[in-house]
């Protein structure tokens, strides 16, 4: 079982390393999201440089990168504790993809994907939190920061077994948003008003 768990952790990282934003933009004839807009290969930046359909495609694929390995591990009857670490591995792949010189995104959608198998109630709460903050502030980055900050609290009340992996995910995503946090404090962070 240990070998199977390690295999799934590695597989999750490799799946996470497939950058949906870069590949979708490449196939759509769009500029590389790492060099355009906010320079972040994620759905929000794809929304900035293209349209809602393309961004939604990236969002869906990024969510799947988290959901597939965690659900796969669940069906393989891997211990619940390790499911969280498999999810963290998928997010690390998104953030530091081996296939794209370790320059990836911030893993917000992939993290959501890893948490969906815990329960749709949790997924609904996370999506609702993100949408509410975006609607109120028009800042996608702030919505992500608020959502991942409150996620461990949601998990504590719904499935406390997964609190520690969720805390790890939240810490990683907050670290990846450090530049956004600085810009938010300075009032220079860009909004997505024109696209919503």
From Swiss-Prot:
Catalytic activity: an acyl phosphate + sn-glycerol 3-phosphate = a 1-acyl-sn-glycero-3-phosphate + phosphate
Annotated SMART domains: G3P_acyltransf
Pfam families to which the protein is assigned, alphabetical: G3P_acyltransf
One term of GO molecular function: acyl-phosphate glycerol-3-phosphate acyltransferase activity
Keywords: Cell inner membrane, Cell membrane, Lipid biosynthesis, Lipid metabolism, Membrane, Phospholipid biosynthesis, Phospholipid metabolism, Transferase, Transmembrane, Transmembrane helix
Domain of life: Bacteria
Quaternary structure note: Probably interacts with PlsX.
Family named by the database record: Belongs to the PlsY family.
Name of this chain's protein: Glycerol-3-phosphate acyltransferase
Organism listed in the record: Colwellia psychrerythraea (strain 34H / ATCC BAA-681)
Organism lineage: Bacteria, Pseudomonadati, Pseudomonadota, Gammaproteobacteria, Alteromonadales
Name of the gene encoding the protein in the UniProt record: plsY
């Amino acid at each position: 079982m240990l070998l199977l768990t390690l295999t799934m952790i590695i597989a999750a990282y490799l799946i996470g390393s497939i950058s949906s934003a870069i590949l979708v933009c490449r196939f759509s004839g769009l500029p590389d999201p790492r060099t355009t807009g906010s320079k972040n290969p994620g759905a929000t930046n794809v929304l900035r440089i293209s349209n809602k359909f393309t961004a939604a495609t990236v969002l869906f694929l990024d969510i799947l990168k988290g959901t597939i390995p965690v659900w796969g591990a669940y069906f393989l009857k891997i211990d619940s504790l390790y499911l969280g670490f498999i999810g963290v591995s998928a997010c690390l792949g998104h953030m530091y993809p081996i296939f794209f010189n370790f320059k990836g995104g911030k893993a917000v959608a992939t993290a959501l994907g890893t948490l969906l198998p815990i329960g749709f109630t949790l997924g609904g709460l996370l999506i609702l939190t993100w949408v509410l903050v975006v609607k109120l502030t028009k800042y996608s980055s702030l919505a992500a920061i608020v959502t991942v900050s409150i996620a461990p609290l949601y998990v504590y009340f719904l499935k406390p077994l997964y609190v520690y992996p969720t805390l790890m995910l939240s810490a990683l995503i907050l670290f990846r948003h450090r530049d956004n946090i600085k810009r938010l404090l300075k009032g220079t962070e860009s909004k997505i008003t024109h696209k919503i």
